[in-house]
Curated annotation (Swiss-Prot):
Coiled coil segments of this chain: none
Binding residues annotated for ATP, in chain numbering: N10, P11, T12, S13, G14, T41, G67, D68, G69, T70, L71, N72, E73, T94
Enzyme Commission number(s) from the entry: 2.7.1.107
Highest taxon, organism lineage: Bacteria
Protein name: Diacylglycerol kinase
Record's keyword terms, sorted: ATP-binding, Kinase, Lipid biosynthesis, Lipid metabolism, Magnesium, Metal-binding, Nucleotide-binding, Phospholipid biosynthesis, Phospholipid metabolism, Transferase
Record GO biological process: phospholipid biosynthetic process
Amino acid sequence: MRKRARIIYNPTSGKELFKRVLPDALIKLEKAGYETSAYATEKIGDATFEAERALESEYDLLIAAGGDGTLNEVVNGIAEQPNRPKLGVIPMGTVNDFGRALHLPSDIMGAIDVIIDGHTTKVDIGKMNNRYFINLAAGGKLTQVSYETPSKLKSIVGPFAYYIKGFEMLPQMKAVDVRIEYDDNIFQGEALLFLLGLTNSMAGFEKLVPDAKLDDGYFTLIIVEKANLAELGHIMTLASRGEHTKHPKVIYAKAKSINISSFTDMQLNVDGEYGGKLPANFLNLEQHIEIFTPKDVFNEELLENDTITDITPDKQ
């Protein structure tokens, strides 16, 4: 019996490129042995709804084609269910942090080849209160950049749009008094921002979590304490090289469970999208989602365990 695949795609991502090559993508997957269909999202929440429906229809494979926000919605549609389908990713967003972390090809057909090759690995995801994320959660004014940057600017200058918006927001930054409980530790004080990372790539910074593992059951927690603009600029420069972890204003730790609260209003960023406000409880769900990955993705820099398996569809 042929395996069934469902593509869930954002037609506006990547300058609408996926929509134009969709017929070729369907043919390529059909030739590889997948009975394939597609669904185009129209508004926020559509990808989650369709992922839930696809799960009920017992698809063997879901493919998320879009940015990190689309992938987040698909993960939220399947994360709570025991019979989760395997997940393929076609990175089509402005930054594609998760795709970068997995070393997925940036071209559509190359990403489909990864799916067809059939190598999968189990990766961690995070649970924040009642929703899920696959790459990062964060709080602080600067972390709002990804969802406050205008879409038009992103389409014109790509990832540089985030840097433009980030520099624009720097003067607005102020430290907030927060309480962060992480495993058996507590931080109580003023912080400019905090980040919980599951991968090594966040907001285009591929060395923000230089020792990230995708499957070890731990978040990487980064807290930037109260600092002036000069200190913050220095930290950001160091972060581009992965050298920020020893800065005196930076707390860098690993944790499985994290609770964050504040008496001050603080918005949250979840996989690059608005994620509500504090308080929040975070829990790492170890090796919870099975993702198609390149053959060479397993190495000590990315994965703690050799969890890769091979899947070959029936072409009959």
